[in-house]
């Protein structure tokens, strides 16, 4: 078998021959856990009376009583069954001490723990007790074991020569033997001294001290490690260490050793306060020993900060900041804080104030790009001040007024690039008329912009016009309607047709004097403008360019429409949208012929979604250039999703080279040709608690696989193990244009389960999210 098809074949076979998935694993595991029968008594249980039944009783009031044969003792939530119980009372009548002595075996139950043992002593007033040769099992959650001696207290239990496991009866996959175990009931954790970790009864690990959670509360300590191997990292091992600093603060520190790179320190701090929540993370490798960088003494690092807060009722603060040491960081390291396929790291901060009819904000925004070809990076917008205002229902409800205004300074790391202040005001008036047949929106708008530009300080920096004033009016008429009918050939279905017609006019202004000409190939136009990627919904946008530096002329009519099919329950099952722009005159931004619409109409754009059934979903989009009779862009996805975690998805995507260069710049496609990829993603839960994920993407133009992944996870009630094998396209320094470089890696994760209430996940979602091309669900009409 051809090697590149091996992973995909395994994924298909797994799906075809899998048995019906078992019920939810968490529910299965709870079926083997004892449950408390009856209603839980709250309050001070110790103050409740004690009820005793037995075959025989010898009572010597008020000091003692002996019960023999089928003794049944109850107090609140406590229930004791035994063959012999002696109850003694001492002290005075106001503060009596009541003790129960159990001999020749007992069965004790309450709402937290069940115990079987030989002999026991109970203080019926304080609930303290001492048990010998006992077996115990938690109520309502996994956890059981044995102990030579158990001392019970109100909030904790002390066990001597004890064992603990979260495995159910009949499963001895793992257990911990310890000279002493202390289980803290309210805090929900256990301390163990001289702990020996055993797998199927065989000791494999010893530690003088160990902590394990026995509930849902977060606890400081070691988390589950992971290990693996890859071409770039060599053998690697990562050990997370968790510190529960406070209920609203925690820190996870993860040292990671890579045999080919060295030690990497990773940390993540999470916080939740009255004025906001967020996450601060860092990754640091002091010296990268990988062969490509060994002579550079290169430090590799990442910093990440995400923060969201609301304060003083009307104020909002948002920060999303990621910075890495170099452009190749996400190529060389797997990180949850970014991917190489993103193309850039976002660095953004914004503080805003909101009122019902206006808001203003102060922000700073820049990008760190990863493209090796680009020597001049994008502009940073620091500072940027925005003010928005609206007033509706003017002129007796006929008019609505909106105002967007902005002042922003643009700067660049390159001394060849000019800097600028941009001042912009954008008032608009619109009148919206609607009835049951549709709506008509008439809008007029004015773009008034002033630039104060300064030549770059570099030796060969180009001259720029110091002051540029640009005023562009806009007029738009937008007509929409909704028509419906019952379908004769599809009984119990209703079809709607929603025609959409828009006329847009904006006069031409030559804007070549805004910004530099050096950044057009890779960074768009001006300071923050670039062509917007096209789809059906973009046909009705006001502008072809993002940002404000390029506002193209427009004299165009857009015709489009959407048809929808609804079933008898009113659920949308299918839709299809199609449209095209007809240019009455060329749309231009300057005198360069390359920057105008070359034809009298845009490409046809189509979007469609089909919920074939509750298990099958299909989505597709397509753009066809009628003037070249060629496809500009196409993608489709078909997904079978019978259950929550079971899915098979087949997808295809195509983008021609002309579309890429026009919309994304020449640097977006290193191979200078069309992108044509087919992919298959399989995620399936199969019998005996196995889960498998297979992912394969093939570039049909390059005739090379882009990414291959096979992940297998075994899940039981008390442990899980996963293995992931991955092969994906990467790159290295000084790589030639036609060279394809792959990174092969294997990752292994072991996990103890049953220690919390929500740790029985199949692992499919985690495996689907791994990789350069993570799974994206086919859009459905749910």
From Swiss-Prot:
Transmembrane segments: none annotated. The keyword Isomerase does not apply. Together with LptE, is involved in the assembly of lipopolysaccharide (LPS) at the surface of the outer membrane. Component of the lipopolysaccharide transport and assembly complex. Interacts with LptE and LptA. One of its GO terms (cellular component) is transporter complex. This is LPS-assembly protein LptD. Belongs to the LptD family. Its main location: membrane. It is found in: Cell outer membrane. Residues 1-23 form the signal peptide. Keywords: Cell outer membrane, Membrane, Signal. It comes from Haemophilus influenzae (strain 86-028NP). InterPro entries: LipoPS_assembly_LptD, LptD, LptD_C, OstA-like_N. GO terms for biological process: Gram-negative-bacterium-type cell outer membrane assembly; lipopolysaccharide transport.
